[in-house]
Each structure stands twice: as C-alpha cells, then as structure tokens.
C-alpha cells in the first residue's frame, strides 16, 4: 500500500514537471512573439502607416533582413517590405488571376508553353527604384514541379525560375 502512494506521488511529480515544462515553453513562445511586436521600430511603423493608413489587422515578421507587414485590403493579400532604416523596399500584391495584370502580360503568358500548366498564383511586385514586375507561378499537373515567371508590364519575360525545391517565396534579393 505504501509503494502505491509513492508510485502515485512519483507519477504526479513527473506529470507536473512535464506540465510545468509545457507551460514555461508556451509562455516563452508568447513572450517572444510579443517581444517582436515591441521590437518593431517606431520609424518603420510610421513609414507603413503613412503608406497604408487604412490597413487593419497587420501582422509583422522579419524576413531577408527586412520588416514585412502582412495584411488584407480589398480582398487581396498584401506584403509591404521595409529595410531597417524604414525605407520602403517593395510591395507584393497577391492578385490571384490574370484578369488583374496588364493585358500584354496575360497575352504573353497565354501564348507561352507554361500556360498549359496549372496557374497557382499571380502577384504584382512594385518597387520604389525598379520597374514593376508581375510574377506568375505555375505548377506542372500531377507533379511537384513549380515555376515562377517574371514579366515586365509590357509582357516581356524577364526571368523563369524553377522553385520546386525552394518554395515560391518572393523576397527583395530576387530582383537585385
């Protein structure tokens, strides 16, 4: 009977220890997430609010050395990138269809062999110092092969990337 009590205490001790670990781990995750929100420099927040004063439910993350604001506006997902000096780097608008891109881009894509693939995503990327780029992402049917096609607004294909292994993440370094 005594051994049973010790066993129960032993089990409770380790259960509490595991619970304590999970509790501490979840609190650390919460603190680190809120710490990032506190770390967002005021000048970056101000630069963003100047560009998008009507944006709500903005989520921030750090990527490729930049601060990225993610939000939805007019039923479109928008990512706005700023460098550490609060300078606007680029904006990515997820427009999701060819109907929302310049006609020469849609025509050039439809005339290409890539149009036979499944259309996965369409994004318009704007920059302060570079021309606009339209990125069309396609996927080979019944395959894991994915490609990104980079067009100028006049319909000229600038670049084609196989992103099968990389994923389709767009970041400023792709355009340097």
PLM features: what roles do these ranges have?
Residues 38-176:
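Interaction-mediating elements
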Residues 1-40, 48:
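Bacterial Sec-dependent N-terminal signal peptides
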